[in-house]
């Protein structure tokens, strides 16, 4: 049985709760460390999902939960905000199980039992985007959508059921070739299979965090509104809506604009 290192903070000013949990390795795991922090708006009776920002290599995104921009974005959809400090992005190390264990523990600590069932939306930068993709391949039924920004070592094997999870894959026009090619080839190899994915190129940008938040947030809100069923029971496993092949995002490569369309 895994041990839990638990810390609790109550933020009175913003009427929210912040919880910290670390999940040490057990005898079968090899992910090194897995630390999590979650923010929950005190006025939210029932959460609908978890917005998770994942850090780049050797990073730590736990402080993201105190960012008011992410808090406001999340609370509009009745989402929690999650940050993490994770070393390994390969699910066979047990890191995926550690994430699920952390959510089950947060469910008990916060008295939000729905945390054991509600879906994640993951926005990952660089290494964090690779983690988002790998976690989605491992547990597609728990992912409402994800963003992967400019990683270069995404798993290139078949994505299987993850092709049904809406994704925004972003490369930088001036980033290193191997990063552009890794993500572009994954996209091109899976679109013929019906992958519900977008490939976007940030003009004039290298390996930097995307700061066009209106664009990123629009994708998040659109996907959440389409995928989470209305009047669903959030206290049991949730069957997310599948996106119809008759809708999609059409990009204009000359103007760098993107629009949701119905065919």
Each model region followed by its residue ranges:
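The feature captures the conserved acid-bearing segment of alpha/beta-hydrolase catalytic domains
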Residues: 144-218
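Loop/turn elements at helix/coil->beta-strand transitions in domains of secreted/extracellular proteins
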Residues: 46-50, 77-82, 117-119, 140-145, ...
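Sec-dependent N-terminal signal peptides
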Residues: 3-13
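A domain-start/cap signature at the N-terminus of enzymes
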Residues: 16-50, 120-143, 153
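Cell-envelope and extracellular/periplasmic
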Residues: 54-58, 125, 132, 136, ...
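Gly/Ser-rich "nucleophile elbow"/oxyanion-hole loop immediately N-terminal to the catalytic nucleophile
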Residues: 45-46, 93-127, 137-140
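Short substrate-entry loop that stabilizes the transition state in hydrolases
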Residues: 44-91, 177-179
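Conserved small/polar residues in nucleotide/adenosyl-binding loops
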Residues: 261-263
């Amino acid at each position: 049985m895994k041990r839990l290192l638990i810390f609790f903070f109550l933020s009175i000013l913003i009427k929210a709760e912040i919880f910290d949990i670390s999940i040490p390795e057990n005898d079968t795991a090899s992910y090194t460390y897995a630390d999590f922090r979650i923010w929950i708006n005190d006025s939210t009776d029932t959460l609908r999902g978890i917005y998770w920002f994942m850090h780049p290599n050797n990073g730590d995104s736990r402080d993201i939960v105190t960012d008011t921009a992410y808090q406001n974005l999340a609370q509009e959809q009745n989402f929690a905000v999650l940050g993490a400090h994770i070393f390994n992005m390969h699910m066979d190390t047990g890191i995926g199980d550690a994430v699920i264990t952390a959510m089950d523990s947060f469910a008990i600590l916060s008295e939000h039992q729905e945390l054991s069932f509600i879906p994640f939306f993951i926005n990952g930068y660089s290494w964090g985007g690779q983690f988002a993709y790998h976690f989605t391949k491992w547990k597609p039924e728990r992912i409402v959508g994800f963003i992967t920004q400019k990683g270069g070592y995404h798993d290139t094997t078949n994505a299987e059921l993850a092709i049904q999870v809406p994704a925004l894959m972003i490369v930088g026009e001036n980033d290193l070739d191997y990063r552009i090619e890794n993500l572009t080839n994954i996209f091109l190899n899976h679109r013929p299979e019906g992958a519900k994915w977008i490939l976007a190129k940030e003009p004039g940008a290298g390996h930097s965090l995307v700061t066009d938040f209106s664009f990123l947030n629009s994708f998040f809100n659109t996907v959440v509104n389409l995928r989470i069923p209305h009047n669903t029971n959030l206290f049991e496993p949730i069957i997310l809506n599948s996106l119809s092949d008759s809708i999609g995002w059409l990009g204009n490569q000359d103007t760098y604009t993107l629009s949701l369309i119905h065919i």
